[in-house]
Amino acid sequence: MRYSVVIPVYNRPGEIDELLKTLTEVTYKSFEVLVIEDGSTNTCAHIIDRYADSLDIRYFQKENTGQGFSRNFGFKRAKGDYYVVFDSDCLIPAHYFDAVNDVIDQHNGIDCWGGPDRAHESFTPVQKAINYSMTSLFTTGGTRGNRHHIGSYHPRSFNMGISKEVFAETRGYIITRMGEDIEFSIRIQKSRFNAHLINDAFVYHKRRTSFKQFYKQLFFFGRARVNIWRFHPKELKVVHLFPLLFAVFLIYSAVGLLFNFPLSKELMMLYLVFGVVLMADAYRIEKSILVALYAAAAGFIQLTSYGLGFLREIFRANKEQGDSIINTD
């Protein structure tokens, strides 16, 4: 068996149903599925039963330990040569494993891979806008997986695969949440394994369904970036300050308009131009005025919430250690 698909889930039976349905429709069939119920009160046991005949599926219930350690739980019980992890809110296109197989066969085996995410046609306008914001060069600076990726590529565990040798060497996740996937990806590469970005191995990632949920998630992501520094100090770069600067100057310019602060009008004009750029680019991709408007809002929410989360955690880190934590190399 080539692949073991490991899916941790916490109180989301509806998402698991949709994900498993897409896995029944993939063209490559040499894989098993391990669903890890991570201490849920609203379990998906009844959903798993529906797929017993159409998928090689195993279901485990355990105490809540978080998604990172739940993936380790699955890896230890996996039978495949490669371990694939998806988030429960993903939909898998039919060609996914074919795209990965092509790269594995071309390189006579690979250590680790990840792929991008896209918006499915069934997504709501808000979901499409959030997907745009989370994948756009203008809002991520090319730090996430796409064709315009800048710098070292670190697969994210909404769409990631590793060989069983990688797991044997690294022992998997050492933190269970708050940047656990990036920390794992960094450690994989430090162990001299290679990570491949496979653009055709994309998934449809629902992410959050409201801007309030999106704000909370990105605030957490900002905190997670500082948490990663605790394990890998050199991985915190100047580029990670950009959302913080975005948030600080946005607040300054907004308050400054009320109290006539210096340069507040000029700064606000720059933010307006940035918003127009986001709308134009989102409209080019989605061909929807509503999605374009939402995309501009999502971009501002993403950068501001990430920056504020980063700021909160950096204060905590400075209390723990008096050193400077920004690597300028």
Residue ranges and their predicted role:
Residues T22, E37-H46, T65, D87-P93:
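A conserved acidic beta->alpha catalytic loop
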Residues A119, T140-E165, T176-R177, E183, ...:
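A recurrent flexible, glycine/aromatic-enriched loop bordering the glycosyltransferase active site
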Residues I174-L236:
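Catalytic donor/gating beta->alpha subdomain of glycosyltransferases that bind UDP-sugars
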Residues K62-A78, A99, I150, H154-F158:
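Glycine-rich, basic loop-to-helix element that forms the pyrophosphate-binding segment
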Residues K21-S30:
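Short, acidic, metal-binding catalytic loop of nucleotide-sugar glycosyltransferases
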Residues T43, C90-V103, I186:
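Acidic donor-binding/catalytic loop of UDP-sugar-dependent glycosyltransferases
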Residues Y83:
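Short aromatic/hydrophobic "clamp" motif used to bind/position activated sugar donors
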Residues H95-K128, A201-F202, K206:
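Conserved donor NDP-sugar-binding/catalytic core segment of glycosyltransferases
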